[in-house]
Amino acid sequence: MSTSSPFRVASKIVTAGCLCLPLFQRVLSDLSCEENEMCVNYDERYPDGWYIWFFLLIFLVVLLCGVVLFCLQCWLKRCGINPPRRTMAVFAVGDLDPVYGAEMAGSPTSGICHPTQNTELCSAPCFGALGPPPPYEEILKAN
């Protein structure tokens, strides 16, 4: 009969606690006190094992930061923030209108395009020598 994952994790936590308990008892115990000697109260002297509590505190802070970062990563992955943006160039050509180009940057999921400035697009004089485009019927005959 197999146990589920939460019970395995709980048993590992209990095992780790049982292994760490003697370490903490040793830090908190007064080892310098013998049977015939007068013992010094633990609260009246500086503990020798302060660094263990310091490392335990650092470990807990790192563990907390790791859990927060893991949850943040899962949340960002689920929300799908920052979808890849695509650029689309639109050129409008008409008999009476000058030739101009506009570049739109839009998101594929939102369908909203935002005009952007692009200096690489040719200006109207660049296309002025070509003349108007051929009629639709001539294009069909050429194919």
Curated annotation (Swiss-Prot):
The keyword Membrane applies. GO terms for cellular component: membrane. Coiled coil: none annotated. It is found in: Membrane. Its main location: membrane. It is a single-pass type I membrane protein. Residues 1-29 form the signal peptide. The chain crosses the membrane at residues 52-72. It comes from the Eukaryota. Interacts with WWOX. This is Transmembrane protein 207. It comes from Mus musculus (Mouse). The gene is Tmem207.
